[in-house]
């Protein structure tokens, strides 16, 4: 299994490295510091060794190569929606290779892999490419790549792809973006927002990286048929009020992967809100340990 084109990702670890490893993959253009630290601590308290890498083109990880113009991105989205093939500087499978290289670097032979949004798509590609190294898969607020459900609703997609203008406070712009797709009533404190912006600013051209990541999503295509051949214990968690990726996208993954478990959370949007940290941490940790028991049988 080759990962010759993989990039070395920046990462942080939490907990005891002798415990079962859980790799958490963040979403589109977002640095790993966006994983709420109290949520990570809950996973550590439940006996997991948590690894949070920055995906390529995010945070402190290397930037990808290739320029994608806004015009090219627009026409690529149209081609994808119509069922056409898209070429890109890299694919989600290439991003999965980055994760496998990180596992090699950390000496992790097998890991539980979880991801939110785009990170959940990368996690699927890790499992599809390296089932023998994937102890379990957790898909949070994500999709299978089916153009009918997996691109996102245009209004919400526009909100996350539109950069702030010169007159807009970046902190207020980020808050409004998160509120546009997140759980109604969820708040984001200034320290958290500042930390995310500071980490994102480590990329010389964050918007160029976001466009490359979207192109990677488009180029990967529809994974539904491949997911039907997946034999990795899979948990799908999806907000029932997700304004970006409809809950049907999560149900579609669960329907494709045999033996998977679907957990819909009423009122939750496209985020991991404070009010559901414990519920999600409990579900993820339980899934990891159930999967480990199944593997030993």
Which residues fall in each region the model found?
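Short beta-strand/loop motif that positions the catalytic acidic residue
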Residues: 230, 236-238
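Conserved HGGG/HGGXW glycine-rich cap/lid loop of the alpha/beta-hydrolase fold
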Residues: 7-80
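Conserved alpha/beta-hydrolase catalytic His-Asp/Glu region
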Residues: 170-212
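Flexible "cap/lid" loop of the alpha/beta hydrolase fold
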Residues: 137-166
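Catalytic active-site module of serine/aspartate enzymes centered on a nucleophile-bearing elbow/loop
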Residues: 260-297
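Acidic catalytic loop of the alpha/beta-hydrolase fold
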Residues: 241-245
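Conserved hydrolase catalytic core segment
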Residues: 109-148
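Conserved acidic catalytic loop of the alpha/beta-hydrolase fold
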Residues: 93-110
